[in-house]
């Protein structure tokens, strides 16, 4: 398919668009043809003039030509800013350490690390025996594996317990479909037998011959089957272990801390179930730990003969329970507490470490098994991100954790849990960065229903002028996923030009379970009004200047962008909407589209009439109005499996037809990428440079867009 797409991208117009001179084309955007397609649901007929832009095979000449015309138009509109884009790219590149390596860690007799080398996009993974000062042995060189491909991502690297065999999962298209390959570590050649159509989730059993993996449905791409593979055999001989029949659930795999169990996770947005396979008897059937119950989530681990389970079966928030065996009652160890979300835990011989979120910020607590004495890791910044890092060996009194803030580069620490002595192992090196030049803050703004919404922000001290700075507000607000306020070296290119950068921790994500519930399904509108209110609050507090306000979000955050430009178009000068989920009604009505069925608990199921009208009330594609809109840059990937390319393409086509005024509306489709954009550490910088240069060009329209006056 890639060769066909390349040819289509190179050909001239197929007659869908009128030819224009170069000067005229700068001012006239592609106009997509209209082919009315009526979708009637609950007696409501929606006419979609751009439904034809959907091509599941991604080969339609008309579709490819339209996307190519949009790409050309975007390039022409932004070409005057190419020197600015290059300047920003060079800044981003210069801040990136060219030769770098991770903090090594010990596991099963070996020390592991990854590293990157100057001029190369991908990581190299290596190991050597513990306490050895000898040469590192290369396990996988991502640069070699990526040769000849436009896109490359390694999803998993798994080594057999006897340290002899390597399995890796790789995606070469950007659709999260992984191929698993094998190699004996002491041999250079990769084996011919591969496993296709997998989720990238792979786990070895303890016999060193059995590998469990997850199959994806070929149409919906849902991970739905657990399969057992015998090393050295053909995939056609593999045995089905478990198949999930309910397409609102996803299947995943993990191995317990004890290494005694393969954990089969069957999860939806708000319900989970786990099945266990004896890792020492991988031919045995899986046993259910606790049958699923709607609205109940639990997440188990196993260590020292007991199960440790994070669950909300007794309370809307999570507690931690200890279970002696599958049939034993669950004994509460950490009771659920209002206002505290237990988000994760790590098991050690002498310690339990828990990761909890309170008021949107993460706390890390250490608890002694022997004395039950507790200690909490202290953090200095007013707003920050912290997490339990990689601790693969439990027989230690040392905890490794990560920390970052909007003014503190990503850092890896170790803390002695006996003495509480901390050691900084590594901090991201950023050329010419001085933390003292920047200020981070956390403020609370009042939403229209009276709820207080936190906002994390950062700016350069010497460039901050009350009420005079350009302001960029970022948001997501879905799946309960927190956009924690971490450091970004790329962001410095905005801060050093006087921008205030803010993250609005809106309902739907960020502050824990209750905050999530208040921003999903029947409460989804809160997500959008929170973002608008957060922006207004920032302006009223002097963190930005009206007419110089910008917004950015991607995926579900792209939905957020689509909703807020419909609801408050005059609040923002420019918007960047990356891989936006904007045709919510049509997508959620089609169970054949990847991710649809698994997200009914997030958005609702429009086959239900109440859900239908509620979703339609905010779906960006269905609420475009004949009004002035801000300048908008939309990006997508042709091979995106999470938000199909045709959603942003249709949205742009319809916006261009209906909106008033001459604001810029640009669509860029990466013909070789998926949901995550370009692969490789340097290639990804190009996307950031384009987004930032677009915003900076709008800050200087007289120079870059004089025709927009």
Regions found by a protein language model. Give the residues of each.
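Conserved beta-strand segments of alpha/beta enzyme cores
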Residues: 138, 240, 421, 500, ...
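Glycine-rich His-Gly loop
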Residues: 116, 312, 404, 474-480, ...
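Cap/lid segment of the alpha/beta-hydrolase catalytic domain
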Residues: 143-157, 169-175, 189-191, 402, ...
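Beta-propeller folds
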Residues: 7-13, 17-398, 402-410, 414-419, ...
């Amino acid at each position: 398919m890639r060769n066909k797409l390349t040819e289509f991208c190179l050909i001239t117009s197929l007659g869908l668009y009128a030819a224009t001179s170069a000067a005229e084309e700068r001012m006239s955007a592609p106009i997509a043809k209209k082919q009315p397609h009526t979708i009637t649901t609950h007696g409501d007929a929606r006419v979609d003039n751009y439904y034809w832009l959907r091509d599941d095979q991604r080969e339609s000449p008309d579709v490819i030509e339209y996307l190519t015309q949009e790409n050309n138009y975007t390039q022409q509109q932004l070409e005057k800013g190419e020197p600015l884009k290059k300047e920003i790219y060079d800044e981003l590149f210069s801040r990136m350490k060219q030769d770098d390596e991770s903090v090594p860690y010990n596991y099963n007799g070996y020390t592991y690390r990854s590293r990157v080398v100057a001029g190369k996009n991908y990581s190299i993974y290596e190991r050597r025996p513990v306490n050895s000062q000898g040469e590192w042995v290369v396990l996988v060189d991502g640069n070699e594996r990526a040769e000849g491909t436009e896109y490359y991502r390694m999803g998993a690297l798994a080594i057999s317990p006897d340290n002899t065999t390597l399995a890796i999962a790789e995606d070469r298209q950007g659709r999260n479909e992984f191929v698993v390959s094998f190699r004996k570590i002491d041999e250079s050649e990769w084996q011919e037998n591969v496993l296709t159509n997998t989720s990238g989730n792979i786990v070895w059993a303890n016999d060193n011959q059995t590998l469990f993996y997850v199959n994806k449905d070929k149409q919906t791409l849902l991970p739905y089957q657990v399969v057992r593979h015998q090393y050295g055999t053909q995939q056609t001989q593999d045995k089905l272990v478990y198949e999930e029949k309910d397409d609102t659930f996803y299947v995943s795999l993990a191995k317990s801390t004890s290494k005694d169990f393969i954990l089969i996770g069957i999860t939806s947005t708000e319900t989970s179930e786990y099945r266990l396979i004896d890792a020492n008897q991988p031919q045995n059937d899986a046993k259910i730990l606790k049958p699923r119950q709607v609205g109940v989530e639990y997440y188990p681990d196993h260590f020292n003969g007991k199960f440790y389970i994070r669950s909300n079966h007794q309370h809307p928030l999570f507690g931690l329970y200890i279970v002696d065996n599958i049939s034993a009652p669950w004994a509460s160890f950490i009771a659920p507490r209002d206002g505290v979300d237990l988000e994760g835990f790590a098991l050690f011989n002498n310690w339990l470490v828990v990761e909890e979120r309170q008021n949107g910020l993460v706390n890390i607590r250490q608890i002694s098994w022997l004395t039950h004495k507790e200690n909490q890791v202290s953090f200095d910044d007013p707003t920050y991100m912290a997490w339990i890092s990689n601790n693969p060996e439990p027989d230690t009194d040392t905890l490794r954790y990560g920390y970052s803030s909007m003014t503190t580069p990503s850092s890896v620490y170790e803390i002695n849990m006996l003495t509480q002595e901390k050691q900084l192992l590594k901090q991201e090196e950023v050329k010419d960065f001085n933390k003292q030049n920047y200020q981070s803050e956390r403020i609370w703004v009042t939403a229209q229903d009276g709820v207080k919404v936190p906002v994390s922000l950062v700016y350069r001290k010497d460039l901050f002028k009350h009420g005079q700075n350009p302001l960029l507000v970022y948001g997501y607000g879905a799946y309960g996923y927190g956009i924690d306020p971490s450091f970004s070296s790329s962001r410095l290119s905005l801060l050093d030009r006087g921008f205030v950068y803010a993250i609005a921790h809106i309902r739907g994500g960020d502050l824990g379970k209750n905050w999530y519930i208040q921003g999903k399904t029947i409460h989804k509108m809160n997500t959008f009004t929170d973002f608008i209110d957060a922006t207004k609050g920032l302006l009223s507090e002097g963190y930005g200047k009206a007419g110089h306000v910008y917004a950015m979000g991607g995926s579900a955050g792209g939905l957020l962008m689509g909703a807020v430009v419909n609801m408050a178009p005059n609040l923002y000068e420019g918007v960047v909407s990356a891989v936006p989920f904007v045709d919510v009604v049509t997508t959620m009505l089609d169970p054949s589209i990847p991710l649809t069925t698994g997200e009914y608990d997030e958005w609702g199921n429009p086959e239900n009439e109440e859900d239908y009208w509620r979703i339609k009330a905010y779906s960006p594609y269905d609420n475009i109005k004949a009004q002035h809109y801000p300048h908008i840059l939309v990006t997508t990937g042709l091979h995106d499996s999470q938000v199909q390319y045709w959603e942003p393409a249709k949205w742009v086509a319809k916006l261009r037809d209906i909106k008033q005024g001459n604001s810029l509306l640009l669509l860029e489709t990466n013909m070789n990428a998926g949901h995550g954009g370009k692969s490789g550490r340097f290639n990804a910088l190009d996307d950031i440079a384009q987004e930032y240069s677009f915003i900076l060009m709008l800050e200087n329209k007289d120079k870059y867009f004089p025709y927009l006056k």
